[in-house]
């Protein structure tokens, strides 16, 4: 490491100049990879391990990181610190080796907190909408010439990366409540989009514990910091009196400090007015569909307005917003004639939403923007515990589409739970009489089974957080043509 690189490190995190080599266990995850990318660009030696290559590991390798596709004790040799994903168990051989060598082992949020320590941190928390809101704040700050650093849990499509090192004092980051590690962060501004029961295993199944953890997170703000909170959310409204910090509220509610009014949607664009205290009305065109995205934009505008960013910069950023990967992600519109012999087209949209509230928001956005389309969903439930805990909510939400295909539950390391599987969920939905679900036990048959339900005027939602995104990409690459064996005619 040369003198210039050392000087650069001292300017970012003064005491971290003692650190040379940072190793990440589970480096291919979006949150881990984003932090690794920022640190690589700051001049640190980066290494990491994961089970298989993906776009995140490819990007890091292009920046000079050493990537191992195995977990072995020798991978942590010479590391100054080991950063571990919450998905990694404590008996991982690299973790064991690090402890034996007395190398510090920390969670990703602790490293993110160090990056934030000497910057003006803006942390975006909440059950839903974190990734998109983080990208919106980052886009506005970039449009205003503020050159922020950002670390996001999803791909920021305009930048083509999950994270980027800026050269200003601003750091905008997604704050993850799934393992309560966001308590390590000490931002200047915190957004909370909403609070629902999710990741309840972290909170001992106690919703009060989850709510108190969000309060504790907000109390990490300095007394002169600001909490920006969605007052439409009933839990946030309940908690507001307990937030001992300056607050700005936003939402469709009449008493919101930043109020969304007159929302309409045309295709993928939302149009609405934002009313702000002691400011001119802001007439917004947002290049992202759905009322939920209008709320995300309102949060971003609240932060930008507080920072003194010009309205013209805000409006330009929102109108040109390119979204994030796997959040109502348009993959194309394809002719159906090669697929099933029918005339017309099918739009293909990939979406990460895996909680009933998120799936409902995606369906509503699709209905509002394309009301005449036949709405077809290929859904992959994520985790048996979530399917069990939110079973009735899933059944109610999934009844809203015109045709439903369902993959088996993506276990994410969990053991099956009787009655919380896709077959049971299909049976329950079928019993409600609104839609007749099709169980797709073999993902390789997804294209062929989709072809059976397409009408010629379709919007296909590929929905879920597991490996279903690969199916979406495969469908787009084969232009929706079914994979048939021998028989080229499929009706």
Curated annotation (Swiss-Prot):
Binding site for ATP: 126-132
Record keywords, A-Z: ATP-binding, Cell cycle, Cell division, Cell shape, Cell wall biogenesis/degradation, Cytoplasm, Ligase, Nucleotide-binding, Peptidoglycan synthesis
UniProt pathway: Cell wall biogenesis; peptidoglycan biosynthesis
EC numbers on record: 6.3.2.8
Matching NCBIfam families: murC (TIGR01082)
GO process terms (BP): cell division; cell wall organization; peptidoglycan biosynthetic process; regulation of cell shape
Function: Cell wall formation.
Annotated Gene Ontology cellular component terms: cytoplasm
Protein's cellular compartments: Cytoplasm
Molecular function per GO: ATP binding; UDP-N-acetylmuramate-L-alanine ligase activity
UniProt-listed HAMAP family: MurC
Gene: murC
Organism, as annotated: Enterobacter sp. (strain 638)
Pfam families referenced in this protein's UniProt entry, alphabetically: Mur_ligase, Mur_ligase_C, Mur_ligase_M
Protein name from the UniProt record: UDP-N-acetylmuramate--L-alanine ligase
Segments forming a coiled coil: none
Family: Belongs to the MurCDEF family.
InterPro entries: Mur-like_cat_sf, Mur_ligase_C, Mur_ligase_C_dom_sf, Mur_ligase_cen, Mur_ligase_N, MurCDEF_pg_biosynth, UDP-N-AcMur_Ala_ligase_MurC
Catalytic function, reaction form: UDP-N-acetyl-alpha-D-muramate + L-alanine + ATP = UDP-N-acetyl-alpha-D-muramoyl-L-alanine + ADP + phosphate + H(+)
């Amino acid at each position: 490491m040369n003198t210039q690189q050392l000087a650069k490190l001292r300017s970012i995190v003064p005491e971290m100049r003692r650190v040379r080599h940072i190793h990440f266990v589970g480096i291919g995850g979006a949150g881990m990879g984003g932090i690794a990318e920022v640190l690589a660009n700051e001049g640190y030696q980066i290494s990491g391990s994961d089970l298989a290559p993906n776009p995140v590991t490819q990007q890091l390798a292009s920046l000079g990181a050493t990537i191992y596709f195995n977990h072995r004790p020798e991978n942590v040799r010479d590391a100054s610190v080991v950063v571990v994903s919450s998905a990694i168990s404590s008996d991982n051989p690299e973790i064991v080796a690090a402890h034996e060598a007395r190398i510090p082992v920390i969670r990703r949020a602790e490293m993110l907190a160090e990056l934030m320590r000497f910057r003006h941190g803006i942390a975006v928390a909440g059950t839903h909408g974190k990734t998109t809101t983080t990208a919106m704040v980052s886009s506005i700050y970039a449009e205003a010439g503020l050159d922020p650093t950002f670390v996001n849990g999803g791909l920021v499509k305009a930048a083509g990366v999950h994270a980027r090192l800026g050269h200003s004092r601003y750091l905008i980051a997604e704050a993850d409540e799934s393992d309560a590690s966001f308590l390590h962060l000490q931002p200047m501004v915190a957004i909370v989009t909403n609070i629902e029961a999710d990741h309840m295993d972290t909170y001992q199944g106690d919703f009060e514990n989850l709510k108190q953890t969000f309060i504790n997170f907000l109390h990490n703000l300095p007394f002169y910091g600001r909490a920006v909170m969605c007052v439409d959310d009933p839990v946030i409204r309940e908690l507001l009196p307990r937030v001992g910090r300056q607050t700005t509220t936003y939402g469709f509610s009449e008493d919101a400090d930043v109020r969304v009014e007159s929302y309409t949607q045309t295709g993928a664009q939302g149009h609405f007015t934002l009313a702000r205290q002691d400011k001119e009305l802001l007439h917004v065109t947002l290049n992202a569909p759905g009322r939920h995205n209008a709320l995300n934009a309102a949060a971003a505008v609240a932060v930008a307005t507080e920072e003194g960013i010009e309205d013209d910069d805000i409006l330009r950023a929102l109108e040109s917003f390119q979204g994030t990967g796997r959040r109502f992600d348009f993959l194309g519109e394809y002719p159906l004639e090669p697929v099933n012999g029918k005339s017309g087209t099918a739009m293909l949209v990939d979406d990460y939403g895996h909680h009933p509230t998120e799936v409902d928001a995606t369906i509503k956005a699709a209905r509002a923007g394309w009301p005449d389309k036949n709405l077809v969903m290929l859904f992959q439930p994520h985790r048996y515990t979530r399917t069990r805990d939110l079973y009735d909510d899933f059944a109610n939400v999934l009844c809203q589409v015109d045709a439903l295909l369902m993959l088996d539950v993506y276990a994410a390391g969990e053991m099956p739970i009787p009655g919380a599987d896709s077959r049971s969920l299909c049976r329950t939905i079928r019993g409600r009489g609104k839609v007749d679900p099709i169980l797709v036990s073999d993902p390789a048959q997804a294209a062929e089974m989709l072809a059976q339900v397409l009408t010629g005027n379709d919007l296909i939602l590929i929905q879920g957080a597991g490996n279903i995104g690969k199916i979406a990409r495969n469908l787009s690459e084969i232009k929706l043509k079914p994979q048939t064996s021998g028989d080229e005619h499929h009706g």
